[in-house]
Amino acid sequence: MGALAHTPEGMFLQDIGYTQDISDGVSRGWLQITDELRPPGSSQVRASVLATMSDVWTGTLAGMACAPKLALTLDLTARIVGDVGGDRLDIVGRLLKQGRTTIVAETDFRHPVTGAVVALSHATFVASPRPQDVVGPLSAGRTSGNALNRPIAEALGAQVLSPGVVLIERGPYVNQPSGTLQGGVVAVLAEVAAETLTGARVVELEVRYLSAVRVGPACTSAVTIDDHTVRVEVRDAGNHDRLATVVMARMDR
């Protein structure tokens, strides 16, 4: 997953309501939460949506630090620590480390009235070693409106084949400009796999990106580790079942 110079026309991020502004090296803004961003039967926002927003918030900062090289996301976490059941969250992202080889970032999700931190995310980025992976100037501000009219997993095309087995086809709505599956889509895919396997809500995700889904479809397999933990693998089924992502999901049960 890489930082975007802008949100491509027709991509799912344009259908999520948020505003982002970067100044003095800090990425600030807010996320509008609608029912489409919640799991079925829950008042809480999806952990994978928080992971996606974290990648947008700090991926832009990492991209600016790596420019003109593309910043690639190596790993991404989202941990819900409070009530995320309102209709808005304020978001603050910053870089914790900017080294020669890696960049580490943190994102806080805060209650819009009290300012209390209700979710946390951390991400590690690296500049792409491929000379062709370059980006233009990154925007210091973005705004998009709520346009989802069905649950986000359904909108992204997630198909549940059996408990823990979910697939998503590549396509313009879910792809990066490079044609690979966008990393937030992979996080949603893994979250749905863990949900369908256990019947419980995900409250924490640890996502390790190993390779891009270049052919598709992306397909999951999931196993329970203990009463609260599910391990999910995401593979590129059209590319010799290449392992693309490993996810650890913590369940609320």
PLM regions and their residue ranges:
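Short solvent-exposed loop/turn micro-motifs enriched in small/polar/acidic residues
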Residues: M11-D15, R100-T102, P151-A153, A200, ...
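Alpha-helical transmembrane segments of multi-pass membrane proteins, especially transporters
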Residues: A47-S48, L74, V232
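Non-catalytic linker/capping segments at the edges of enzyme domains
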Residues: M1-W30, T34-E36, T124-P172, R253
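Intrinsic-disorder/low-complexity, polar/charged segments enriched in Ser/Thr/Lys/Arg/Asp/Glu/Gln
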Residues: V26-R28, D75, R88-D90, V104, ...
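Hydrophobic beta-strand-centered segment that forms part of the acyl-chain substrate-binding groove
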Residues: T58-D90, L95, V188-T220, T224-I225
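HotDog/MaoC-like acyl-thioester-processing domains
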Residues: A71, G82-L148, A212-V215, T224-R253
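Hot-dog-fold acyl-thioester-processing enzymes
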Residues: F12-Q14, R28-G59, G164-T196
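Residue-level recognition of conserved beta-strand positions in structured domain cores
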Residues: L31, I168, Y209, V232-V234
